[in-house]
Amino acid sequence: MMLVLVSTLSASSQKKWSLKDCIDYAMQNNITLQQARLQKRSATEDRKQSQAALLPSLSASTNQSVGYRPWLSSGMTTVTNGTVNTKVNKTYYNGTYGLNASWTVWNGNQNRNQVKLNKVSEEQAELSIAETANSIQEKIAQLYVQILYMNEAIRVNKESLETSKKNEERGKQILEVGKMSKADLAQLTAQRSADEYNIVEAESNLANYKLQLKQLLEITSDEPFDIEIPTATDEQALAAIPSLASVYEKALTIRPEIQNSKLDLQSSDLQMKIAKAGHLPTLSMTGGLGTNTGSMSGTNWGSQMKTNFDASLGASLNIPIFDNRKTRTAINKAQIQREQALLDIQNQEKQLYSTIEGYWLDANTNQQKFISSCSTVESEQASYDLLSEQFNLGLKNIVELMTGKDKLLNAQQNKLQSKYMTILNQQLLKFYQGEELGL
């Protein structure tokens, strides 16, 4: 008893995911999106490194060595209290110490343009995150609506099954009084079996859509998952659809894929400047401080550090004369990339228009289908109710009854499908205008 109670409480406490819940969770956990964020972090590091390259570099160095001269016969002579002492030290030590700096003063603005280029790359990485997020949100919305539709389809199929069961029971009663053949009853039984099959198929499709949605959310397949069922009213499906031109004009200004393609053009222009700088001279400066010590010098370490200290400052000018066409090739390739970027902008705008046009056509087409199917369901329901009464009175045969039932079921399913497809495409059109997805 306690186990049953715990199971009941667990089932009742299972979370129902709204569309917003699904989107918010995916934005934090989807692996593809996390990979895009890592690319952005990498681009940020590239930008920081290029900015640091504008500054001088500084390094310190030291070298310590020890040597041994086994055949050395003379050494260092000292006089102490009138006594002459000679010390032969076959082992000796040397040390050098240095501090060096270098700075590229000017290289045709290559360094500064590289900073600008890496800033553009960083912006593009950020836009790529937005592109990935938008794509995931669209897929989530599509799967979410498919799940809503399949839930409704299962409900309609179950209602159809109940009707089939009643018809089958009524057929058995009519058979007993001799007013129906066994062949006609078999058709009613087959209809009931077909409705049961339709339910199984719809439930299988529902499970598949849920699995796809869980995969987008990075939820393991063994975790319980179900969505919140919002009230999708007929008024939502009948709402006004924005014009194709207004959606496209707005999308051109806010969609990250368009902005990203335009940044490709900026990137190619900067690469052109960097390539052209290969024809210009490079001015560099170097400086250094150094000293050295040795055990054979006869003076102490501190004195040697001071005596041997030296400082240096230098400048170098590198003028390119012939580089085996490397610079010319880089310039030409940058020009090719610029032309490619222009074509990519046109292609992205074309793809955007095609996508929006598809959603707009689907929204309008399904809305018209929905309006038509509403009256069709009413008429088919009235027709089937009349057929059912006439069948019970023996005025209609089994074929006419089953035909009427099939027409009603098809009309109900068409109404559901057109309703949810209209709502989905309306939401996607709003999404392309910068609004959040919601049902």
Each language-model region and where it sits:
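Periplasmic alpha-helical coiled-coil/stalk elements that build and connect Gram-negative outer-membrane
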Residues: E45, S135-K250, D362, N366, ...
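Bacterial Sec-pathway N-terminal export signals of envelope proteins
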Residues: A11-N63, R69, S221, I227-Q266, ...
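Sec/SRP-type N-terminal targeting helices
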Residues: Q34-L38, Q51-A52, T91, V105-A133, ...
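N-terminal signal peptide c-region/cleavage motif recognized by signal peptidases
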Residues: V6-T8
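Short segments within alpha-helical structural elements
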Residues: A194-I219, C374-E435
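Small/polar, glycine/serine/threonine/aspartate-rich low-complexity segments that form flexible
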Residues: S61-W103, P230-A240, K273, T286-I319, ...
